[in-house]
């Protein structure tokens, strides 16, 4: 609004509007709220600045810490700017409140204007022979002064409030901390796996059930009315001695009773059961479909984690690959120079436990080829029942004795295939028994 517009209205209008308003209390309350918000922004900015500085100083390390600092530094700057903007907004609200107080103080009051009008009326009423011409002119000039003063005050108040409104800063939106689209994958999975509850189908079924209940209720009411009509016919026939009317009344009462019982004891329970059954089917079907729909989504990460845990263990088994090839048994090596001695049977056929095969035996010539055959002692045909065993199996070379010096090992040594069956192992200190 401009000054001529303010001058177009009498001062009573401006004074009444200004004095009848809410007053400066609302502006001062808003200023206090903006001040509190500014302090809150400043406190949060200070606390977050400490955290960001600690992270940047090396409390956390790695790319996550760098991303954290890069995301929160702009947010801290926004908090500082928001605190400053809130403080400025509080100051502008206080300026507007002060402008209102000044305008109210400078505005001609309604009692002053009423007194001016009363004085003017008295002067005009007592203006005999023009004796009050000068006082009337002065009174009117004073009213013009108040008119101009009211317009000037309103113009000044408008300028102050307009300047405060223009100077009030507008805080922009906070910077984005979380990356856009970070939750799109989980939301997509949830949308794909969790289907909404079929409320539409439930509403249609309940509508049909309500219609069915209404029809059953009408059947019950009509049956009750028919029973009442039949009862009246029965009573009338009995009173007037009209057998056909009595018969008609009894028939009507019978069919009415059947319809009433059918509606109350059969149709109503069936409808209730149908409603409960439909609710159970919809609920159970929805739950089962969501559970089985979520199984593939949950199985993917679980199988990935399981594979990550199993693959290192399987990689450790690769060391067993060397066991696939068993070295072939070569030719018999030459006998050692000091071989276990000659076996001289003792009387009775028992060799003393302390007897050791200590005598020297000349080794076989190197050119002598010793056939290696497997021993036929102790083991039968191997494999499934009915399969034929193979006799052409390589024999162990040399004498293999599993006993030690203390007799703690196996008492029966493995004998070469060239030895006869006249020696068997017996319990003892590593000795042999001849038979």
From Swiss-Prot:
InterPro entries: PPE-PPW_C, PPE_dom, PPE_sf. GO terms for biological process: response to host immune response. Pfam families: PPE, PPE-PPW. Belongs to the mycobacterial PPE family. This is Uncharacterized PPE family protein PPE47/PPE48. It comes from Mycobacterium tuberculosis (strain CDC 1551 / Oshkosh).
